[in-house]
Regions:
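S-adenosyl-L-methionine
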Residues: 23-73
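A short SAM/SAH-binding and catalytic strip from SAM-dependent methyltransferases
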Residues: 77-91
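Conserved beta-strand signature within the Rossmann-like core of class I S-adenosyl-L-methionine
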Residues: 78-80, 107-115
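Conserved SAM/SAH-binding beta-strand->alpha-helix loop
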Residues: 17, 117
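Conserved SAM-binding loop of SAM-dependent methyltransferases across substrates and taxa
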Residues: 1-6
Length: 150
């Protein structure tokens, strides 16, 4: 059976300190990822706080804000939490922030993070997440997957 899946992805990115154009140019990603350079530029050039169709069935909304200001409830299926670690940005790894994430996820929604610190795991569990340790990507021994359960 060969049926075409036609799902749409609505990706919401929340960033308090975005990379500016000069910094982006210095990274030289256009020359590194040549085949996707136009998409990369489109993602960085599109306006903040507005939904953009990046590709057919892929929509991006970049929100210029702190996650602590997010008030969406039961809206997201997945959160990719790729902040600097708790040692560098302890304010992003608190029960307060994880409760906001828990509330913003739909039932059975998933949060993933490269941080596998015990304090992170405990804070996720304390707000209601079911937390699992997973094998990490190259360079990381472990990562965490937290699922919103009742």
């Amino acid at each position: 059976h060969n049926s075409k899946v036609n799902n749409k992805v609505y990706y919401h990115g929340i960033e308090a300190y975005p990379v500016n154009k000069r910094e982006l140019d210095l990274l030289n990603y256009d020359n590194i990822i040549k085949s996707e350079a136009s998409i990369f530029r489109l993602i960085h050039d599109c306006l903040w706080n507005k939904t953009h169709e990046i590709l057919p069935n892929f929509f991006l909304k970049k929100k210029l804000d702190f996650f602590s200001n997010v008030n969406e409830i039961n809206m997201f299926n997945v959160i990719y939490f790729d902040a600097f670690g708790p040692r560098v940005q302890p304010n992003l790894w608190t029960e307060f922030i994880f409760k906001k994430m828990y509330d913003s996820l739909r039932l059975n929604g998933i949060l993933v993070t490269y941080s596998a610190k015990g304090s992170v795991r405990r804070n996720l569990q304390s707000v209601g997440f079911l937390v699992e340790r997973l094998t990490g990507p190259p360079g990381k021994r472990e990562m965490l997957r937290a699922t919103k359960v009742l």
